[in-house]
């Protein structure tokens, strides 16, 4: 900004000098000697001539003089060829000075225009600098806020991971325990091999006791391994494509070894026929099935097969029915008091999905909603024989906002939708009566899930997705403590 200001100062100083010079010098230049004729006192005219140049071409000359009858003087003069001003040296100087002043004035105008242009440029630059300074401050503040958010996110992540440190230590201890089991089994195998070679080397009762003890410990370990916290869901495997957009299919988690029957129920209301396939292979590759007719049509897609019986919600009611698939007889009915039905509190996809029956490692469950709980999800643990409610938990999650739900190890997991992008984002732990929001990706391959149930035997999720029967493997995080074995 200093260069344009210096130019302005030079212009102002030059103008002041010119003004001062003109006020002092020009009057003396303008006051030139003139030629005049004056009348003498007494009425006679005297001829008076000023100082004139001697050159006749540059001065006035008296040609003749006389008096008239009244005594007035009459003179005849000859004018010079050119005016006196044009030939006067001082007049030339004045003209030259005026020309210089005009030139300087023009230069000053040019300089002033340039100065004004520079001043405008400087003002523009000043505004740009102010704008850049403001933007820099904004960027600096935004950077600080961004760093603060990153710091908070990292701190939250650290706070989330810090409790896992002792868990990892326990997990390492559990790994050592499993390794110890493996070594004991190897030792027993070696002992049995030696015993087989040398009968009588060891006391049989003592050896049998050691084997039984190890079996109990291994069984307890396997039971602990069966439960855990859900940490991941695999991509779906499409088993079959059949039926309408809505339905359910399942296997019996308590079926004896070798019983691999599959149960298939198409539709969500006003249907009574259940298909039975001999095995998963038959279900995948053939249409050979046995049909069972239920005494009442079912409602929704929340049916389960558990220990040889099918449990379902009777259409347009809050009644649960236990139906024996072998004898084809109703073993028990029970009303879920206050439970909504007939599309009062369904899942987000609708379909009379008011009451959803589930099974996990702990037994039989019912998930529904009531007016008393403002339409939010209610979880009830049921006796699988009598259908009596053993315990109930009221959650704060609206059932109409849930896409689907399933239970693993006593924890209810809820998806945020049934179509498009889906994830598991809510979990309620019944053992602690607490909940948390989670973020577990869930691939919704066919964009319309109407049934999602967990099978503790297969440790897999069974889903009905827009006429496709699919399976998902689950990943559970296990913690086994040695004092629990």
Swiss-Prot record:
GO terms for molecular function: amyloid-beta binding; identical protein binding. The protein structure is stabilized by calcium ions. Disruption phenotype: Females have slightly lower body weight than wild-type at birth, but strongly reduced body weight one to eight weeks after birth. Mutant females do not display normal estrus cycle responses to male odor, and have very low fertility due to a strongly decreased rate of ovulation and a low mating rate. The protein contains a globular N-terminal tetramerization domain, a long stalk formed by the coiled coil region and a C-terminal olfactomedin-like domain. Interactions between dimers are mediated by the coiled coil region. The dimers interact mostly via the N-terminal tetramerization domain, giving rise to a V-shaped overall architecture of the tetramer. GO terms for cellular component: AMPA glutamate receptor complex; axon; axonal growth cone; endoplasmic reticulum; extracellular space; extrinsic component of postsynaptic density membrane; extrinsic component of synaptic membrane; glutamatergic synapse. PANTHER family: NOELIN, OLFACTOMEDIN-RELATED. A motif (Endoplasmic reticulum retention signal) lies at residues 482-485. Disulfide bonds join 227-409. Expressed in the brain cortex, olfactory bulb and vomeronasal neuroepithelium (at protein level). Detected in brain cortex, hippocampus, dorsal root ganglion and olfactory bulb. This is Noelin. One of its GO terms (biological process) is cardiac epithelial to mesenchymal transition. Contributes to the regulation of axonal growth in the embryonic and adult central nervous system by inhibiting interactions between RTN4R and LINGO1. Inhibits RTN4R-mediated axon growth cone collapse. May play an important role in regulating the production of neural crest cells by the neural tube. May be required for normal responses to olfactory stimuli. Residues 226-478 form the Olfactomedin-like domain. It comes from Mus musculus (Mouse). Homotetramer; disulfide-linked. Dimer of dimers, giving rise to a V-shaped homotretramer. Isoform 1 and isoform 3 interact with RTN4R. Identified in a complex with RTN4R and LINGO1. Peripherally associated with AMPAR complex. AMPAR complex consists of an inner core made of 4 pore-forming GluA/GRIA proteins (GRIA1, GRIA2, GRIA3 and GRIA4) and 4 major auxiliary subunits arranged in a twofold symmetry. One of the two pairs of distinct binding sites is occupied either by CNIH2, CNIH3 or CACNG2, CACNG3. The other harbors CACNG2, CACNG3, CACNG4, CACNG8 or GSG1L.
């Amino acid at each position: 900004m200093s260069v344009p200001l210096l130019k302005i100062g030079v212009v102002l100083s030059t103008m002041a000098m010119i003004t001062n010079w003109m006020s002092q010098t020009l009057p003396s230049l303008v006051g030139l000697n003139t030629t005049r004729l004056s009348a003498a006192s007494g009425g006679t005219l005297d001829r008076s001539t000023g100082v004139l140049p001697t050159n006749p071409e540059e001065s006035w000359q008296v040609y003749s003089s006389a008096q008239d009858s009244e005594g007035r003087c009459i003179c005849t003069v000859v004018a010079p060829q050119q005016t006196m001003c044009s030939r006067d040296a001082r007049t030339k100087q004045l003209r030259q000075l005026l020309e210089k002043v005009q030139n300087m004035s023009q230069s000053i105008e040019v300089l002033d225009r340039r100065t004004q242009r520079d001043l405008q440029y400087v003002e523009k630059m000043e505004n740009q600098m102010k704008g850049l300074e403001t933007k820099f401050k904004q960027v600096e503040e935004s950077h600080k806020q961004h760093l603060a958010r990153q710091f908070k996110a990292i701190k939250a992540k650290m706070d989330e991971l810090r409790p896992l440190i002792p868990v990892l230590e326990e997990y390492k201890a559990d790994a050592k325990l499993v390794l110890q089991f493996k070594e004991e089994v190897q030792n027993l195998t070696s002992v049995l091999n030696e015993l087989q070679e040398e009968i009588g080397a060891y006391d049989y009762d003592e050896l049998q006791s050691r084997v039984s003890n190890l079996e109990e410990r291994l069984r307890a370990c396997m039971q602990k391994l069966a439960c855990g916290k859900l940490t991941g869901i695999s991509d779906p495997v499409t088993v079959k494509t059949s039926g309408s957009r809505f339905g359910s299919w399942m296997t019996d988690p308590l079926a004896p070894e070798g019983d691999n029957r599959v149960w298939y129920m198409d539709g969500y209301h006003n249907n009574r026929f259940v298909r039975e396939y001999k095995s998963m292979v038959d279900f995948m590759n053939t249409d050979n099935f046995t049909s069972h007719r239920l005494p009442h049509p079912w409602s929704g897609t929340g049916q389960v097969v558990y220990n040889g019986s099918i449990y379902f919600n009777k259409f347009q009611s809050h009644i649960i029915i236990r139906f024996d698939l072998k004898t084809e007889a109703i073993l028990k009915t029970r009303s879920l008091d206050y439970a909504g039905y007939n599309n009062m509190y369904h899942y987000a996809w609708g379909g009379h999905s008011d009451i959803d029956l589930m099974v996990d490692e702990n037994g039989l469950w019912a998930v529904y909603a009531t007016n008393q709980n403002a339409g939010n999800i209610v979880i009830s643990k049921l006796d699988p024989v009598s259908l009596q409610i053993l315990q109930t938990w009221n959650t704060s999650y609206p059932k109409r906002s849930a896409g689907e739900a399933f239970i693993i190890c006593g924890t209810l997991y809820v998806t945020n939708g049934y179509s498009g992008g889906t994830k598991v984002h809510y979990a309620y732990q019944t053992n602690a009566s607490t909940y948390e929001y989670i973020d577990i990706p869930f691939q919704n391959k066919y964009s319309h899930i109407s049934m999602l149930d967990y099978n503790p035997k297969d440790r897999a999720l069974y889903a009905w997705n827009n006429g496709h029967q699919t399976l998902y493997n689950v990943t559970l995080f296990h913690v086994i403590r040695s004092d629990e074995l």
